[in-house]
Design a protein with these regions (language model features):
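Catalytic Walker B motif of ABC-type/P-loop ATPase nucleotide-binding domains
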Residues: 166-170
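Helix-to-loop junction immediately C-terminal to a conserved catalytic motif
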Residues: 52
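Conserved ABC transporter NBD signature motif
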Residues: 60-70
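Conserved ABC ATPase signature
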Residues: 116, 141-145, 149
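H-loop (His-switch) and adjacent beta-strand-loop-beta switch element
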Residues: 216-229
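Conserved ABC ATPase "signature" region
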Residues: 103, 118-137
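Conserved catalytic motifs of ABC-family nucleotide-binding domains
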Residues: 162
């Protein structure tokens, strides 16, 4: 079993009098792939922001890649973390080309300036873009891409700095069925890659959980309903308590989950 990548101890987050997270105890190890699932407003994105050193807890302690938040240079720490999120996509300069968007992740910046990239950086960026099925888009502007293409390019960017931790905030949100299935399949391949970093994926749809994910946390109103190995956590009872409605849960032969009301 690998070393510890994330550790939350009694973590709470409050903003404007509202409790966004309540007493979260959680740890992620190097060889684990976690999905965080729950309804809208459950605290999933807040949890990911804390894990990505983008937000400090109001109470409790957080260790990210062996560094304690509040006692570390977070700008340096963030270079060791890959992040793909809608908030990041909104900050991309409209004329940014796909190749440049991926390359600039080496410096944890957006927008090409005067920085220099060697042949190794360019080769890695091209390989990642190709791995995510976007080789034909390499010279396109990010603003001209479809939603599915943007999601895949964001993941290539998140992987560019060879991160020790990969955070994916609702990567399949806004995709049609074909786009979602293509992305989930690619993420499943990444999850099963022994060389891939530790992963934490946020979603509120169980059908978006890629095969190969090993652990799950179910969140409701900022509190953990259940967490641990995915086979023990993903039950109809746990899912029904998380979403507040009776749900049946099925799993296909390829390891994918599907929920339906009953």
């Amino acid at each position: 079993m690998g070393g510890q990548v994330l550790r939350f101890q009694d973590v709470s987050v409050r903003r404007d009098g509202a409790a966004l997270l309540r007493g979260i105890d959680w740890s992620v190890r190097e060889d684990e792939r976690w999905v965080i699932i729950g309804p809208n407003g459950a605290g999933k994105t807040t949890l990911l922001q804390v894990a990505g050193a983008l937000l400090y807890p109001t109470e409790g302690s957080v260790d990210v890649l062996g560094e304690r938040l509040g006692q570390v240079d977070v700008f340096e720490l963030r270079t060791r973390i890959g992040l793909a999120s809608a908030a990041l996509a909104e900050r991309v300069p409209p004329d940014e080309k796909v190749i440049d968007l991926v390359l600039t992740a080496s410096y944890a910046i957006l927008g090409r300036w005067t920085e220099e990239y060697d042949s190794h950086d360019v080769t890695r960026a091209v390989e990642l873009i190709d791995q995510l099925g976007c080789a034909h888009l390499i010279r396109r502007r990010f603003s001209t891409l479809s939603e599915g293409e943007r999601k895949r390019v964001q993941i290539a960017r998140a992987l560019m700095p060879d991160p020790e931790l990969l955070l994916l905030d609702e990567p399949a949100a806004g995709l049609d069925v074909a786009g979602r299935e293509d992305l989930v399949r690619r993420l499943g391949g990444l999850a099963r890659d022994s060389k891939a970093p530790s992963m934490v994926l946020v979603t509120h749809h169980v059908e978006e959980i890629p095969a190969g994910f090993t652990h799950a946390m179910l969140l409701r109103h900022g509190s953990a309903v259940a967490q641990g190995p995915i086979e023990s956590v993903m039950t109809a009872d746990n899912l029904s308590r998380t979403f507040g409605v009776p749900l049946a849960l099925d799993r296909s032969m390829d390891g994918r989950w599907y929920a339906r009301p009953y």
